[in-house]
Amino acid sequence: MRIFSLIVAGLVLLIQLYPAWGTLYRRFLCKKMNGQCEAECFTFEQKIGTCQANFLCCRKRKEH
């Protein structure tokens, strides 16, 4: 019974870590595309309440 609870605890930890892998993968893709990840919404989208995060929305980096 103790082994079962340890397995369940391990699965819960893996489930919580899964979104972190997605974030790392998106950052890798954006770096590969020479851009930076942007998950912020435009001002007008926030006002009308239709803000959706585009996970692969990469824009070119601005050179200063």
Curated annotation (Swiss-Prot):
InterPro entries: Defensin_beta-like. Expressed in testis and to a lesser extent in epididymis (caput, corpus and cauda). Also weakly expressed in kidneys. It comes from the Eukaryota. GO terms for cellular component: extracellular region. Its main location: secreted. One of its GO terms (biological process) is defense response to bacterium. Keywords: Antibiotic, Antimicrobial, Defensin, Disulfide bond, Secreted, Signal. Residues 1-22 form the signal peptide. This is Beta-defensin 13. It comes from Mus musculus (Mouse).
